[in-house]
Amino acid sequence: MLSKFYEDIDSKLENAMLSQIESSTITCDGKSLNTLPTPKQEDVEFGVPLQPEDTQDLQRKLKPRHMQMIAIGGCVGTGLFVGSGNALADGGPASILIAFAVIGTYVLFTTSALAELSAIYPVSGSFYTYFSKFIDPAWGFAVGIQYWLSFAVTVPLELTVAPLIINFWNASGPVSIWISVFYVIIIAINIWGTEGYGEVEFFLSIMKVISVIGFVILSIIIAAGGVPTDDRGVIGVSYWKQPLVFNNGFKGLCAVSVIAIFSLSGTELVGLAASEAKNPQKTVPAAVKQIFWRIFLFYIVALFMLTLVVPSDLPGLRTSDNSNVLISPFVIAIQLANIRALPSIMNVVILLSTLSVGNSASYAASRALFALAKNGYAPKIFNKTNKRGHPIYAIAVTLLFGSIAYFTEAGVGGALFGWLLSICGLSTTFIWGSICLAHIQFRRAWKIQNRKLEDLPYRSIFGVYGSIYGVAMTILALIAQFYVAVFPIGKKPNPVDFFQAYMAAPILIISFVAWKFFRRTSFVRIEKIDLSEGAHGEQKQNLEPVINIPVEEIDFPMKVATKESMKNVEKNAL
């Protein structure tokens, strides 16, 4: 009964996506896009080198409703519910809105470019295979390794955070018990496979959407003085008064921008999931369109309401203020209104959101490692799948990273959190910038080879200019990160803070130089890019190079071609 209900939802969503993309998708020049071609049964994968489809491929089991909810709430978790406390304390309410709005446009432009690439090349490993194809194989390797590593360490990161959130209830017992509970749950979901990931994210994302909407409504009531137990009365915009509105000035804005990037990391998972989505040419672009609502609802609206009901100078907002417990500012907002029971309910939501991020991270890391092996960037054993199409060895290695979380039992939880976070944070900036650069290169190759934009199955609504903006934002984000790393807020400059903030950069550079040295790779020349390689279904046939032979060179009246006419044909063909 329940499965039939979900099948009906999937069918209706798919029909809605088809209608939306075929009839109402608009480009930046105001023209309608062409109808998407029906993909063939075979799934064409590409990499460096290109490998034909074989039995060692991922299966397309993510349904339209899965893709929709992954796009809306897939990676909403620690960054929003916990990291927003640091953002509010470091930058104040105005800096939060400005930073998240600007970084939000950065994400929108990036994911729109990714949707264009994913629609024509829905491949395993998604975006960093584009880096190898359109930028440099060494860059694809370096970014791919860092992307895998960043999500692999996110698993123990979330396992480390979970007990700190549970300590809100003054939980007793060893931390390792709570780590083990969540560790086992994540392992069980991974054993379930792609279906498990999709179903868990579907329900947890619904929970997060309902919770955030509920928080927004409650915050309006609190700010208006409608809660009888809140002795503050009508709050209004009193927390937006100077000097709290722009804490720490420009440095505070830079610090919040860095937090915003971390909070929005994982948005590109829609592109990674393309390799296991049913009908990715249609579901991926349609899912990407939901990202706008994710950013607007979860971040802009929710954080604005948070700034109205929680003062930025309140002690305990920063994660470093408490060594054994993490209290979300969303929970603090409810506590300040003296509402009983509800803080615990909100804390449960945040705890489950942590599980959601850990689940998404293990999925992303295992699929990234699978793609690295498939493209010759990692040992071939990680390219193997079981009969259900699950990369079992890649999953096993990824899950082993979760054991790092047990170091919290030794009393180094806070320090471990910081170092793991350092690997995750900056890598997101490199990923987004590389996606935009690959899209620019793709468009250049498309133009040089005299292709028409109308022939693309999906076009980025921001065009190539959106990707140029994305590359520029990447440079500015790296500068902001460097500035905050050298001059941290509330501290004197020290090497530990700097390396925690910028450790991802040397990892990327070392990986790039090493691969380039040992494999002697070179930057990809635009005119030599084979646009048909790796294209999906009918798109591959449409992109095959056509040899135009002048009709007059062939002697039609003759039954047998002369040597001279054949030489002319061969000459024109070459």
UniProtKB/Swiss-Prot annotation:
The keyword Membrane applies. PROSITE patterns: AMINO_ACID_PERMEASE_1. It is found in: Membrane. GO terms for molecular function: amino acid transmembrane transporter activity. Keywords: Amino-acid transport, Meiosis, Membrane, Transmembrane, Transmembrane helix, Transport. The chain crosses the membrane at residues 69-89, 94-114, 173-193, 202-222, 291-311, 391-411, 412-432, 470-490, 498-518. One of its GO terms (cellular component) is membrane. InterPro entries: AA-permease/SLC12A_dom, Amino_acid_permease_CS, APC_YAT. GO terms for biological process: amino acid transmembrane transport; meiotic cell cycle. Belongs to the amino acid-polyamine-organocation (APC) superfamily. This is Probable amino-acid permease meu22. It comes from Schizosaccharomyces pombe (strain 972 / ATCC 24843) (Fission yeast). The gene is meu22.
